[in-house]
Regions:
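The AdoMet/dcAdoMet-binding core of the Class I SAM-like
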Residues: 53, 85-230, 234-237, 242, ...
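Conserved small-residue packing positions in alpha-helical repeats and bundles
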Residues: 380, 419-422, 455-456
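Alpha-helical junction/boundary sensor with strong preference for TPR arrays
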Residues: 401, 408, 425, 443-447
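Alpha-helical repeat scaffolds
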Residues: 393-403, 429-443
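Short coil/turn linking the two alpha-helices of tandem helical-hairpin repeats
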Residues: 385-389, 422-430
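Soluble small-group transferase modules, centered on the S-adenosyl donor enzyme superfamily
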Residues: 4-100, 105-107, 146-147, 163-165, ...
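TPR alpha-solenoid repeat register
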Residues: 413-414, 449-452
Length: 456
């Protein structure tokens, strides 16, 4: 009440008529005396605000949508993962860890909802550190334990609140794998995480066979910004490569992976790396449990990326071009997330010999077919009309996905949606379901799911 007293005294002593003073001072009095929340949080229709923290650097909230999925948001603008992106987030952790032959120490830069970091728990010989700039993000992790487990209970996993660049510059030991989360360059300070100097410091941290993966949110970037990041990355990791986290056209994610040695995948990588059933089941949940799923995510090597990005400046501390480029994306008219993804898959060429250890004609042919199917699947995803009605959906996706499977019967992302659709149709349209299952048996005879479903 002392503040109110001083304000009233100010009004009495002020020499101008009272009404001149009333508007600004009265407004201030209202703000002080009336308890009003100044939180600005956009809540989805049918959703709710689950938790909120105001911090020195940012406001952080957990919101749920009408389906009950929880999302972590920073400053109500940047969504940092959640329960609905479990599939994608987990793959972002598994792919780099699987590409290293035997990781013992891993570093995760950025925590978000903790789902990517939680993938480290599936590797029994791995110790992992996770660094998060915003302390309030770590405070809200318990709201995502359904997807992550209780991370603090695992003595192999360590969570720390710190600045990523400072931690990297002062880390006392090397890491086999470093995974950098999805940082939007327009977020305060995030552009500095894409500088040449930062990439060099990370390279200095890597062990002899170490690798660094920088995930990029294609759905929050434009071509100019992406090219700048790629050029900067290749300036430090000339043998870098590009990988897709998944095949979604709504929120595509590209991974740039750099290493001190060439990355090669053995044909029996799955048997070599996955010793425990729990680990296999974890990979199965995110469709990384088949031999071609890991090399199938590969897009191209450093030379292909260099051609794609073209000539131009790199992002550095002295010339922070991303600092000025990235904010333009936030405020310009939104484009379809798939547009940049299509530019990437059309503009970056992959060759089986770039990534496969074995010099087998059959293995090379299968992987090439898988890549063709993958690209066709992505293109079909941008062209197909969506529907919640199973009959309409059958009409829209049956032929495109069967065509994909004819290209590569190994391509599971086209097979399982049709299996699921056949299962739904079996209750209301058994003849249509049976016809679809017969067609699946014909294009993918080595798979058994269609046959099993027909017998029930």
């Amino acid at each position: 009440m002392q503040i109110v007293g001083f304000l009233m005294l100010f009004i009495l002593l002020y020499r101008q008529p009272f009404w001149y003073t009333f508007t600004p001072v009265g407004s201030l009095l209202i703000l002080i005396l009336i308890p009003t929340s100044l939180r600005i949080v956009t809540i989805p229709t049918g959703g709710e605000l689950v938790a909120y923290r105001d911090g020195i650097m940012a406001s952080v909230s957990v919101v749920s949508d009408r389906l009950g999925h929880r999302h972590l948001k920073v400053n109500d603008r940047f969504q940092m993962g959640g329960t609905s992106s479990l599939y994608s987030d987990r793959r972002e952790g598994h792919i780099p860890l699987l590409l290293h032959p035997d990781p013992k120490q891993a570093l995760f830069l950025g925590v978000g909802a903790g789902v990517t970091f939680a993938a480290a728990a599936e590797y029994p010989d791995l110790k992992a550190d996770a660094i998060e700039l915003i302390p309030e993000v770590l405070e809200l992790l318990p709201y995502f334990t359904e997807s992550t487990g209780i991370l603090s209970d695992n003595d192999r996993l360590s969570l720390k609140s710190s600045d990523a660049r400072r931690f990297v510059a002062s880390a006392g030991h090397s890491y086999d794998v470093v995974i950098a989360d999805l940082f939007h360059p327009a977020r305060d300070g995030a552009a500095s995480l894409y500088t040449r100097e930062h990439f060099v410091k990370i390279k200095d941290l890597l062990s002899t066979e170490g690798l660094f993966c920088q995930w990029l949110p294609l759905y929050q970037l434009d071509r100019q910004t992406l090219n700048s990041i790629i050029r900067t990355f290749l300036d430090v990791y000339p043998k870098g490569s590009a990988w897709l986290a998944h095949y979604s056209v709504d929120a595509p994610i590209l991974g740039l992976i750099g290493s001190k040695k060439d990355i090669r995948i053995e044909s029996d990588w799955l048997n070599r790396r996955v010793k425990q059933k729990s680990h296999y089941n974890a990979l199965r949940e995110v469709r990384l449990h088949e031999p071609l799923t890991l090399p199938g995510s590969y897009l191209g090597n450093g030379l292909a990326l260099k051609r794609f990005a073209g000539p131009g400046p790199v992002n550095s501390d002295d010339h922070p071009i991303l600092l000025y480029q990235a904010p333009g994306y936030v405020y310009r008219a939104e484009s379809k997330p798939s547009e940049l993804l299509l530019e990437v898959i059309h503009g970056v060429e992959a060759k089986p010999e770039d990534i496969l250890q074995a010099n087998s004609t059959r293995a090379h042919s299968r992987l090439s077919a898988y890549w063709l199917a993958r690209d066709s699947f992505i293109i079909a995803g941008t062209e197909s009309q969506r529907s919640m009605d199973p009959y309409t959906l059958l009409h829209n996706i049956e032929e495109p996905l069967l065509t994909v499977l004819k290209t590569s019967p190994d391509f599971s992302p086209a097979y399982f949606p049709l299996i699921k659709l056949a299962s739904v149709l079996s209750k209301t349209a058994p003849d249509a379901s049976k016809t679809l299952l017969h067609r699946l048996e014909q294009v993918a005879p080595a798979r058994h799911e269609a046959t099993v479903l027909m017998q029930h």
